[in-house]
Amino acid sequence: MNIPLSDKQIQQLLRYLSLIQKWNRVYNLSAIRDPIESVKKHLLDSLSIIHFVQPGLLLDVGSGAGLPGIVIAIMKPEIKVFVLDSVGKKCRFMQAVKSELALENLIVVNSRVESFKPKKLFSQITSRAFAEASKTIQLTKHLLEENGRYLLMKGSNIEEEDVDNFNMKVHSMTVPFVSDKRSLLEIQL
């Protein structure tokens, strides 16, 4: 992956994983309970897209436990990252992470994506396990600025995605210690 990490980022990422484990017992944030699997399937998976993230406002839709949004906020403190989810308990968790890790660049939004009306539009929108690409675009295009782009994290079944009408690049992602195929759909409207 070749991603340089500062000591502070390492500590923040480890603390974040520990908070996921702690809160997951009560709030059911993720089906993944094993800490090692959490590192592989949450942390490393989210880190795999970090080189594709560019400067500008970023929105992570259907953020759930904050993946990949919180990881991006940790790795790119110069970028303002909005994490959006409609489930209150997940937003309370993300707010606790923001506070605990002192992530000044993270904004937690408890809203349905269709109802969200930001003051400024986003230059990039990410999602992981939210909806198929065409549905994600349909629900969020009112939030994307002109020439903005999507970074949609997907598995191997990208041929099932209905994205024929979009300017799209498909990146095959290699996530260390994860045998499942991963893809990143980079879509510009």
Predicted regions and their residues:
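S-adenosylmethionine
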Residues: I79-F82, S86-L189
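Conserved beta-strand/loop positions that form the S-adenosyl-L-methionine
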Residues: V61-S63
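Class I SAM-dependent transferase core
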Residues: M1-P55, L59, K89-R92, A96-L106
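A general structural signal for well-ordered alpha-helical segments in protein cores
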Residues: L13, L43-S46, G69, F122, ...
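Conserved SAM-binding loop of SAM-dependent methyltransferases across substrates and taxa
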Residues: A65-E78
